[in-house]
Amino acid sequence: MTRIKRGSIARRRRKKMRFFASSFRGAHSRLTRTITQQGIRALVSAHRDSDRQKREFRRLWITRLNAVIRDMGISYTYSKLIHDLYNNQLLLNRKILSQIAISNSKCLYMISNGILQI
């Protein structure tokens, strides 16, 4: 029996992983087994950190909003603002509200006053 090496399918799979790991350093970009292991590890880290990033940005937006609202001088907090926004069915999420708070805090002040008057 002659020796049969794996065909084009396995080569294609290894080539795809090698291209994915081409920016890795050392053996992680040269040896097939370590390329596979590091590729899996990189994807796991990317998935975990994308969830973490969403969490951290949401926390940042909430902190910014709360800081701007408390600086207004009204006895008004972030939680009351969000509660009143939902009760009045205003579709402004935390990201947009924090961008408004950073760029133009007077606009946020007008929004909160409008909610209080309703």
Swiss-Prot record:
Transmembrane segments: none annotated. Its main location: plastid. GO terms for molecular function: rRNA binding; structural constituent of ribosome. The keyword Repeat does not apply. GO terms for cellular component: plastid; ribonucleoprotein complex; ribosome. Pfam families: Ribosomal_L20. GO terms for biological process: translation. Keywords: Plastid, Ribonucleoprotein, Ribosomal protein, RNA-binding, rRNA-binding. The keyword Nuclease does not apply. It is found in: Plastid. Coiled coil: none annotated. Belongs to the bacterial ribosomal protein bL20 family. Binds directly to 23S ribosomal RNA and is necessary for the in vitro assembly process of the 50S ribosomal subunit. It is not involved in the protein synthesizing functions of that subunit. This is Large ribosomal subunit protein bL20c. It comes from Cuscuta exaltata (Tall dodder).
